[in-house]
Amino acid sequence: MLFRSEYARKSIASIPPELRVMVTAHDAFGYYSRAYGIEVKSAQGITTESEPGVNDINKLVDFLVARKIPAIFIESSVSSDNIEALIEGAASKGQKVKVGGELFSDAMGAKGTYEGTYVGMIDHNTTVIALALGGEVPVGGMDGRLAGKTHALSGKK
């Protein structure tokens, strides 16, 4: 088993450089960006109490289209309304963008689950991000404990 930091760095590094950007509803992944070398863009700032304006959404849509980003991410603790607006906006400009999966940001997974631990949360987030953005990672995650949970994202049988 790779240590989680090494697994995360190698997994994120396997994403094509031009696609190495994580787009989420709000800016809760600054730590992840710094630790593992992925750019983070969000519709909202750090707080979820204010809504982004139309101009904010349009700028992010333009970014998605210009960079040809294939996937953006919903968060377990944040409404997906802004993500849906980004997907629709990109589609109106001819860019297909999908939901790459759900990430754990301000809250870990359910208590008593692997994703409910810090290691499980990092493993889950890293595996989901890498699979959605074209990286090379085991579908079951760092040590196979995500088997069957991230399978649909991989496109593999």
What spans do the regions from the language model cover?
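Extracytoplasmic metal-acquisition and chelation regions
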Residues: 1-157
